[in-house]
Amino acid sequence: SKRARTAYTSAQLVELEKEFHFNRYLCRPRRVEMANLLNLSERQIKIWFQNRRMKYKKDQ
């Protein structure tokens, strides 16, 4: 019943990291836009940003 782990392509990661560098928090319209752009669900984007913020915080 558990969903498979998403494997992000290097192109997707470049875009996600670029966006994160610019802004650590994403508003919904931007999230919708990124989801469409990267062929990912809004949920995947949201969770990637959550995880990335935790990594950022840990590395501070």
Swiss-Prot record:
Coiled-coil regions listed in the entry: none
Classify the main location.
Answer: nucleus
**DNA binding happens at which residues?**
1-60
Q: Which GO terms describe its molecular function?
A: DNA-binding transcription factor activity, RNA polymerase II-specific; RNA polymerase II cis-regulatory region sequence-specific DNA binding
The record's subcellular location field reads: Nucleus
GO terms in the biological process aspect are:
anterior/posterior pattern specification; embryonic skeletal system morphogenesis
Q: Name one GO cellular component term.
A: nucleus
Alphabetized InterPro entries for the sequence: HD, HD_metazoa, Homeobox_CS, Homeodomain-like_sf
UniProtKB keywords? Developmental protein, DNA-binding, Homeobox, Nucleus, Transcription, Transcription regulation
Question: Which residues span the membrane?
Answer: none
Family to which this protein belongs: Belongs to the Antp homeobox family.
Protein function: Sequence-specific transcription factor which is part of a developmental regulatory system that provides cells with specific positional identities on the anterior-posterior axis.
Q: What is this protein called?
A: Homeobox protein Hox-B3
Organism field: Xenopus laevis
Whichever gene encodes this chain, its name is hoxb3
